[in-house]
Regions:
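Short Fe-S-cluster ligation motifs
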Residues: 49-74
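Cys/His-rich metal-chelating microdomains
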Residues: 28-29, 161
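Post-cleavage N-terminal segment of exported redox proteins
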Residues: 1-9
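Extended surface/linker regions that mediate inter-domain or inter-protein docking
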Residues: 69-178
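Short secondary-structure junctions and interdomain/linker hinges
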Residues: 40, 44, 57, 61-64, ...
Length: 178
């Protein structure tokens, strides 16, 4: 056998550097890329990245269950989805999660993700551009408030340009690596 030795220190793989790092050497490719919907296939949630409405009647999504409705709200530059449920105890119960990541360019629609510790989950309400309204996220049952759908690495392979999975079998990621 051969024994290969090197005097160079091999570094660990680089983290995501973003498309702007390519701009100087590849300006045409960079300009073309930033004009595509894929350029904004996933990004942090803010007033510019979220396509839906947060005021008036457009901030609500009603379900076939007359005891459940969703409200989208904005507070202090953060955006939330809240399930409002009339319980058996005749009291209003709320479950609210912050929209932290937007997936989808908004050309067709968007769905939203949130962190719970180091795990990533899909929120139950998405935005459909053709109607300009909030809808159930794909595959979510109408009339139920489901906040525990994990977002696995296979989802992120298509819906993010770069994402560091800490556990490929589950929905565990490095939040600072997005």
């Amino acid at each position: 056998g051969h024994n290969l030795q090197t005097s160079e220190q091999i570094s660990s793989p680089a983290a995501y550097i973003g498309p702007a790092a390519c701009q100087d050497c590849h300006p045409d490719k960079y300009q073309g890329f930033i004009q595509t919907a894929h350029h904004i296939t996933s990004r942090l949630a803010d007033a510019q990245s979220i396509a839906g409405h947060f005021t008036g009647d457009a901030a609500f999504m009603w379900t076939r269950n007359d005891k459940l409705w969703f409200e989208m709200s904005a507070r202090d530059d953060e955006f939330y989805q809240t399930a409002n449920i009339w319980g058996e105890d005749n009291k209003l119960h709320e479950h609210s999660e912050r929209m932290e990541i937007v997936t989808g360019s908004g050309k067709i629609g968007q769905t939203y993700l949130y962190w719970k510790n180091d795990r990533l989950y899909q929120l139950p309400i998405s935005y459909w551009a053709a109607s300009g309204k909030w809808i159930n996220s794909p595959g979510y049952p109408d009339g139920q408030a489901v906040f525990d759908r994990p977002v696995g690495p296979r989802c992120m392979e298509c819906h993010a340009t770069y994402f560091a999975a800490e556990d490929y079998e589950r929905n565990v990621y490095g939040q600072g690596e997005f």
